[in-house]
Amino acid sequence: EFTDKFPKTPFVPVIGDVRSLGRMDFVFRNYHPQVVFHAAAYKHVPLMESNPCEAVRVNVFGTMNVADHAVKYGVERFVMVSTDKAVNPTNIMGASKRLAEIYVQSLSVAIRDGLQVGTTRFITTRFGNVLGSNGSVIPRFREQIRNGGPVTVTHPDIIRYFMTIPEAAQLVIQAGAMAKGGDVFILDMGEPVKIVDLAKNLVQLSGLSVKDENNSKGDIEITYTGLRPGEKLYEELLIGGDNVRKTSHPRIMTAEEVYLPFEQLSDVLLE
C-alpha cells in the first residue's frame, strides 16, 4: 500500500523485536535513521492486567532499548507515542507507558545537562484512542452489528477521547518537528465521547435501529458487560491541572511533567 501511494519513495520493511539488543543494533547500524517514531507497545488493557511481565518487557524495556540505540547511533529526534492511560494510571498498561515516558524524559534531560553523552532530542506525544486502529471499538461494534448484535459496552457512562488516524499521524509528526528535547506534548483530542452514544450512532448509520425499553421492535440491542480490570470511566491527558502551556500549533500543548534523575532511574530499572 505504501509503495503504491508513494512509488518514488524508498521503503524498506524490517521485522524486529524492540526487546532484542542485537536486532535493534543491526537496524540502527545499517540504516542510520535521522528520526525514530517509537510506537511499538502492548496497548490492550485487560490482557496486560493478566500479563504484567510482558507489558513491562515491551513497553518499558523495549522503549529503553530503542532509546539507548537512538543515542548510540546519533539519531536526531526520537518521538515516543504514548497514551492518555499513562496519566494517573490505574492499570498495568498505563503504568508501563508512564514509566517509559519518564525514562525518555529523564534521558533527554541527562543529555541536555551533559550527564549523558549524546545529541538526540527526545519527545513524548500523548493522546487518546485512534478511530479505526487495531483493537479500537469501531471495528468491533461494526462486526457486532453485522452479526445482528448485541453491541457490547462496558458501562453506560464510560467516555473516551478519539481522533482519526490521519489526525494522529499529522499531529505526531508536527510535534516531533517542534521539539526542543524532553518535551511532553499533549494533542488536542476535542470533546470526549460517550461510548454508548458512539454505539447508537453506528447502529443508525448502518440503517438499523437500537432495541431498548423505548423501542422493543428495534434491530440491535446494546448490552453492558461491566468495567474490565484496570479500566477507567474516563481518561485524562494531564497529570496536573496547571502544568500545560500553549505552543505555536493550536492543537498541540506542552506539559511540565515530573521525572526522576536518569542515573537513579537507570539503577532502579536495571535491578
Q: What spans do the regions from the language model cover?
A:
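Residue-level signal for alpha-helix termini/capping positions
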Residues: 29, 71-72, 146, 177
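Strand-loop microenvironment adjacent to phosphate/nucleotide-handling motifs in alpha/beta enzyme folds
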Residues: 66, 106-271
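Hydrophobic/aromatic anchor residues within beta-strands of the central parallel beta-sheet
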Residues: 13, 55, 78, 122-125
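Conserved sequence/active-site signature of Rossmann-fold short-chain dehydrogenase/reductase
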Residues: 19, 86, 130-132
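Conserved Rossmann-fold NAD(P)-dependent oxidoreductase catalytic core, especially the SDR/UDP-sugar
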Residues: 32, 40-45, 49-102, 106, ...
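Conserved Rossmann-fold cofactor-binding substructure of NAD(P)-dependent oxidoreductases
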Residues: 12-35, 230
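Short, conserved SAM-binding/catalytic segment
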Residues: 2-8
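Conserved residues in the N-terminal Rossmann fold of short-chain dehydrogenase/reductase
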Residues: 14-15, 57, 224
